[in-house]
């Protein structure tokens, strides 16, 4: 293992149990899947989050669930990345995306927040948008006048929850490809 090859994978969400199963917690759900598959306990408390570390296919990996609430996610991610000296391009963010249908993935090497307050916070705290992200489709509001907060904080219907669960293996494969320097391949295989 290359000792400089360390990655931070952060799943975004809100920490209270009342938010379990909500659209905004798609990142938490995906991170829980990775932690289970990779045998990494995400139970240490520091950096305003729950975190754990392990090794995945020769890469040192730190998994993080910020406990700052979505809009302040950067307040957890930036200090942890700084502590472990993880550069921004080795920070993979898992988050919800209301512009994609439930279960669809949008993989990007960098870019704007696209209206996502969690990503805005991370961009501000890391000092730029040069970090990869796996955006997980949770579906658009049912009508334009529907309150966005009510939508993203609403529970997934069973079929949408299944669509997310069905894509978790693809999220895992995408994270591994990104860590292997093959983000373009991940995009061609798993976007959509």
Language model: regions and residue ranges:
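Nucleotide and nucleotide-moiety/phosphate-recognizing core
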Residues: 1-110, 120-134, 141-147, 154, ...
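Hydrophobic alpha-helical segments within soluble ligand-binding/sensing domains
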Residues: 114-118
């Amino acid at each position: 293992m290359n000792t400089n090859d360390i990655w931070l994978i952060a799943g975004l969400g809100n920490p209270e149990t009342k938010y379990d199963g909500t659209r905004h917690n798609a990142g938490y759900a995906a991170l829980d899947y990775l932690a289970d598959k990779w045998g990494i306990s995400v139970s240490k408390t520091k950096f305003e989050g729950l975190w754990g570390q392990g090794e995945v296919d020769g890469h040192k990996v730190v998994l993080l669930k910020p406990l700052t609430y979505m809009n302040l996610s950067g307040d957890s991610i930036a200090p942890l990345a700084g502590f472990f000296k993880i550069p921004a391009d080795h920070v993979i963010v898992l988050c919800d995306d209301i512009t994609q249908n439930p279960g669809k993935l949008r993989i990007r090497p960098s870019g704007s927040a696209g209206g996502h307050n969690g990503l805005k916070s991370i961009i501000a705290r890391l000092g730029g948008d040069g970090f990869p992200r796996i955006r997980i489709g949770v579906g658009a509001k049912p009508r334009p006048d529907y309150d966005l907060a009510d939508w993203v904080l609403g529970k997934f219907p069973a079929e949408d929850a299944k669509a997310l669960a069905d894509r978790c293996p693809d999220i895992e494969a995408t994270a591994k490809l990104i860590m292997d320097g093959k983000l373009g391949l991940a995009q061609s295989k798993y976007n959509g």
